[in-house]
Amino acid sequence: MAEAAAASTAASGVIGGWTKHVTCRYFMHGLCKEGDNCRYSHDLTNSKPAAMICKFFQKGNCVFGDRCRFEHCKPAKNEELPAPQMLPLPSASLAGPSDPEPSGPTPVPGAQDWVNAAEFVPGQPYCGRAEQAKVESSVPLIEEFDSYPAPDNKQLRKQLCPYAAVGECRYGINCAYLHGDVCYMCGLQVLHPTDNNQRSEHTKACIEAHEKDMEISFAIQRSKDMMCGVCMEVVFEKANPSERRFGILSNCSHCYCLKCIRKWRSAKQFESKIIKSCPECRITSNFVIPSEYWVEDKDDKQKLIQKYKDGMGSKPCRYFDEGRGTCPFGSNCFYKHAFPDGRLEEAQPQRRQTGSNSRNRNSRRTPLWDIYDERESTDSFDNEDEEMVTFELSEMLLMLLAAGTDDEEVIIRPPSCATSSGRLDPTVTRYRKAC
């Protein structure tokens, strides 16, 4: 048995290794979830217990009470921090002579000071919990945080109090700084009594901010009931906040949300002229302007378009790619065409050249919508090329008749079916191969 115990002790020593000589810090604090299986030592005879003092008990409130695993003891007197030295503000000379301090202990504000707090009256300076009337010396005190000399009282009286400027100063009339006049626009004490320039600048800034807020209010009022013409939902009431944006068409005044109109214009099964037109009135708009609010007035829309173009003009064009690529929109592109050295692309003059059909062709890059419009407006068959097209169609007909089956039906669209607008007549000529 003795040999087995010695073997187990040796095995445990090998398993634990050097950690068995280190006291478990969790066990020292009274909590180790490993128990007997812990790799560290649970022997407190050779270890100094940790002095873990409960900081909540020192503050007077520990919810664990006797069950707290930290030590409940008050700090020694030599460990208490010295009280900060109190110095009067530079406005002490304005407060008059002070009475001698009482010999008894000075009452420290406790948790019941809120009972005697000053009543808050709208439009009046809020004094907070400062008991100015009970201060024996009638002088506000501040803690000495640094050794820099205090500024002159005359200099302080020329500066506006930063606390009164936001609506609250605990020192009231005893403040060393100057309390400005109340601005009738913002209701804050930010107007300097003697500086007319500061008063005029602040009043101007307040009026501009007020006008901007009113414009936003009118825009919200104008936009809150607008319904998208595609999804038939109120834009401001969409479930996803990111979808509460309008897609303003440049040449149309119909209302659409940005998601729906972009989806409409990204369709691939229709021609460009169709997808670029309004779904309701069919007026073509070359671009869509994202907007947080609905804009219908002509002047406001022009301002929005110009703001949109200015914003796009500050972003580099990914097609131009600093001169390495080619942008299909050319000089009409909204994005910035700049080279790596910062130079902007110069607008290239349009060069005209005459083709075989006596039509002017533009050799310069043309915007995509102009390309589509030119393609739609161009006749599919020209008069001078009609004989050549007829000959080619005849050859195609002969090839189909030679390679087709007995029951095969061949549909041919001859040049005579072309209308004056360049589109083919829906009626076609049908040929059936004879047996």
Swiss-Prot record:
It is an enzyme of class 2 (transferase). The keyword Zinc applies. Weakly expressed in adult brain, heart and kidney. Pfam families: MKRN1_C (PF15815), zf-CCCH_2 (PF14608), zf-CCCH_4 (PF18044). Pathway: Protein modification; protein ubiquitination. SUPFAM superfamilies: CCCH zinc finger, RING/U-box. One of its GO terms (molecular function) is ubiquitin protein ligase activity. The keyword Metal-binding applies. It catalyses: S-ubiquitinyl-[E2 ubiquitin-conjugating enzyme]-L-cysteine + [acceptor protein]-L-lysine = [E2 ubiquitin-conjugating enzyme]-L-cysteine + N(6)-ubiquitinyl-[acceptor protein]-L-lysine. A zinc finger (RING-type) spans 228-282. Residues 183-210 are annotated as: Makorin-type Cys-His. It comes from the Eukaryota. This is Probable E3 ubiquitin-protein ligase makorin-1. It comes from Seriola quinqueradiata. The lineage of its organism: Eukaryota, Metazoa, Chordata, Craniata, Vertebrata.
